C-alpha cells in the first residue's frame, strides 16, 4: 500500500545497507559500468556495489518511473512529482505507511533497514560480506550491529553431568 517512492527508498536502503542520509544522497552519476559507487557520509568510507539481481531490478524500476516525469532529476530517489526525495518527505511517507500498517514508531524505524540488511547478509553469506556492505572497518562492529537486532546465536549449552 505504500507509495512507489517510499517502496523504492526502502528497497534501496535494504539492498545497499546504508544510512537514510546516504540513500537520499545517491544520484544517477554514481551509477557507472554496472557499479553503484559512493562515499558514506558518516565515516567517508568509499563503497562500490555491483548492480546485479534485485538491486539491478530496483534501479530499472526507478528509471522507468522517473522517465514518466517532464523534468529529469539526477537524484536516484524522487517523489511522486519527480522532485528530489528529501529527508522530510521520506520521514512523512514512512511514518504514514508505518501507522497505516499498525506498527508503533518505537518498533520500526527507517534506519532499522540497515541492521536488517546486515543481519540478513550475514546469515546468507557470512560476517565478512556484511562487514563490507555496511562499511565497517572491523568485524567486531559488524557482529555488534547485526547481533543487536536478533541477539547472538548461542552455540554452546550446558550438559548435565
Mark where each language-model region is.
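Short, leucine-enriched amphipathic alpha-helices that occur as contiguous helical runs
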Residues: 6-7, 87, 91, 114-115
Amino acid at each position: 500500500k505504500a507509495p512507489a517512492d517510499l517502496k523504492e527508498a526502502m528497497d534501496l536502503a535494504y539492498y545497499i545497507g546504508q544510512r537514510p542520509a546516504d540513500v537520499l544522497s545517491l544520484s544517477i552519476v554514481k551509477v557507472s559500468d554496472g557499479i553503484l559507487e559512493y562515499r558514506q557520509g558518516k565515516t567517508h568510507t568509499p563503497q562500490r556495489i555491483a548492480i546485479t539481481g534485485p538491486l539491478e531490478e530496483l534501479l530499472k524500476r526507478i528509471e522507468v518511473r522517473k522517465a514518466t516525469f517532464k523534468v529529469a532529476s539526477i537524484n536516484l530517489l524522487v517523489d511522486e512529482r519527480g522532485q528530489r526525495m528529501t529527508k522530510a518527505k521520506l520521514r512523512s511517507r514512512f511514518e504514514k505507511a508505518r501507522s497505516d500498517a499498525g506498527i508503533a514508531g518505537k518498533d520500526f524505524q527507517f534506519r532499522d533497514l540497515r541492521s536488517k540488511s546486515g543481519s540478513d547478509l550475514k546469515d546468507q553469506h557470512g560476517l565478512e560480506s556484511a562487514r563490507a556492505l555496511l562499511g565497517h572497518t572491523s568485524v567486531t562492529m559488524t557482529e555488534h550491529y547485526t547481533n543487536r537486532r536478533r541477539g547472538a546465536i548461542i552455540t554452546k549449552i550446558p550438559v548435565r553431568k
